[in-house]
Amino acid sequence: MQVTAMDVYRLLPKTNCGKCNEASCMAFATKLIEKEVTLDDCPQLSGDERQKLENLLAPAVKEITFGPEENQVVVGGDEVLYRYELTYYNPTALVVDLPDDLPSEELLNRAQRIMELEFERTGEKLTLDAIALRNRSGSPEKFAEAAEAISKLNFPVVLCTFDVEAMKAALEVLGDQKPLLYAAREDNLGEMAELSVSYGCPLVLFSPGDLEEMKNLSRRLRSLGVTEIVLDPGTFTGEGIGDTIDNFVMIRRLAVEDGDDDFRFPIMGIPALSRLTVSDKIEANIREATVAATLMNRYADILILAGTEIWEIMPVLTLRQGLYTDPRKPQAVDPGVYEFGDVDENSPVILTTNFSLTYYTVEGDLKSGDVTAYLLVLDTEGRAVDVSLAGGQLNGPAVADLIKETGIEERVRDKVMIIPGLAAPASGEIEDDTGWRVLVGPRDSSGIPDYLDKLASE
């Protein structure tokens, strides 16, 4: 059952002291539910009441952190099965494989590429999250050398080996950066648990295709003092992808719907395994990206990839960005006037809405077309042109208010405004309420540069 603000309020001091910077304890309770504040913000909380609140507010899937303190990765924290029920928290961590037997220069170059890979979409920089250092050499010494080399990068690391001695050697040089340890299984459970507790590092539990065994091993790990666990039920690709999806879904259902403490942990998938049966590199990249997208849509909190080609990574990062936006909050930019190029009193004025995807699409088209113009961004509550037109947010009075608030009228000589083609039905109303001449522009912002060239030649 979902926790309400009243459930939280009953356990708060109810003094309305304001030390949390909220007007009342009820307001603080509401923000706790929305995860906008933390229990640490209430100085009067202590003892049993705080513990009760921690238990009450604990998400269905426990949050796990790994990586250096100033560059930590947080995974888990979800409370629902379906995004529309609330939202998803803590985007899937995308981790890239780095074998320890690469020549030292190549090892560092690949690590640097992983760290620096990024692209911008709708104003947000999308990047990879961590390196998976894999003990491909089978040598504890080689594993430790590679761990020491990448420790200087101060970047989150997943240490991948079933060999306890190799894990020990790597932790001696990297343990203070809280790497994620991969992995414990039945034959090394006790030793890996001891390392996890000793170094304070989270531990992956590997039990391929057997959820009953996973449940038993998870319980044993917790009895040994391991509190931060990640579950890997195995990534079977090809004809086995259906079994993989079933296992991921069952684990998350057991956590969210049944509250099964043995499964209330983040899930790891390894799309890199899809490469094992493919010889063609391009086909391998495509298959890996497909598996990554599939598992991300089915509750994967951490994914280990092998490819670093930007054309493979881009769709996975784009899917993650879309999946982890909050459906309760429209994605919007600040309304107002934005300048492109060296504007003056003769520069055209273009109208658009403050829906993020709309704004950044228009921005990209104006920049790529080397357009000099004023861009008026109307507050449509984060809705696109056609949606805001239908919903009544894009209207004459709203545009008139925007003109007044921005002072754009004093910055241009001619009162001429270009509106999106989809906003044509509102052109007359905008003209009447603003007193400006309204021109209906192209339906797609990619046509703006040619449209302006045509206007200038008339």
UniProtKB/Swiss-Prot annotation:
Pfam families (alphabetical): CdhD (PF03599), FeS (PF04060)
Enzyme class: transferase
Annotated ranges, domain 4Fe-4S: 1-59
Alphabetical list of InterPro entries matching this protein: 4Fe-4S_dom (IPR007202), Ac-CoA_synth_d_su_TIM-brl (IPR016041), ACDS_complex_subunit (IPR051069), AcylCoA_decarb/synth_gsu (IPR016218), AcylCoA_decarb/synth_gsu_arc (IPR023427), Dihydropteroate_synth-like_sf (IPR011005)
Example of a GO biological process term: acetyl-CoA catabolic process
Keyword 4Fe-4S listed: yes
Domain of life: Archaea
Catalytic activity field: 5,6,7,8-tetrahydrosarcinapterin + methyl-Co(III)-[corrinoid Fe-S protein] = 5-methyltetrahydrosarcinapterin + Co(I)-[corrinoid Fe-S protein] + H(+)
Residues binding [4Fe-4S] cluster: 17, 20, 25, 42
One Gene Ontology term of the molecular function aspect: 4 iron, 4 sulfur cluster binding
Enzyme Commission identifier(s): 2.1.1.245
Keyword 4Fe-4S found: yes
Key words of the record: 4Fe-4S, Cobalt, Iron, Iron-sulfur, Metal-binding, Methyltransferase, Transferase
Entry's cofactor comment: Binds 1 [4Fe-4S] cluster.
Cofactor(s) recorded in Swiss-Prot or TrEMBL: corrinoid; [4Fe-4S] cluster
Quaternary organization: Heterodimer of delta and gamma chains. The ACDS complex is made up of alpha, epsilon, beta, gamma and delta chains with a probable stoichiometry of (alpha(2)epsilon(2))(4)-beta(8)-(gamma(1)delta(1))(8).
PANTHER family: ACETYL-COA DECARBONYLASE_SYNTHASE COMPLEX SUBUNIT GAMMA, PTHR36214
Known function: Part of a complex that catalyzes the reversible cleavage of acetyl-CoA, allowing autotrophic growth from CO(2).
NCBIfam families: PRK04165.1
Entry-linked HAMAP family: CdhE
Protein name: Acetyl-CoA decarbonylase/synthase complex subunit gamma
Lineage: Archaea, Methanobacteriati, Methanobacteriota, Methanomada group, Methanobacteria
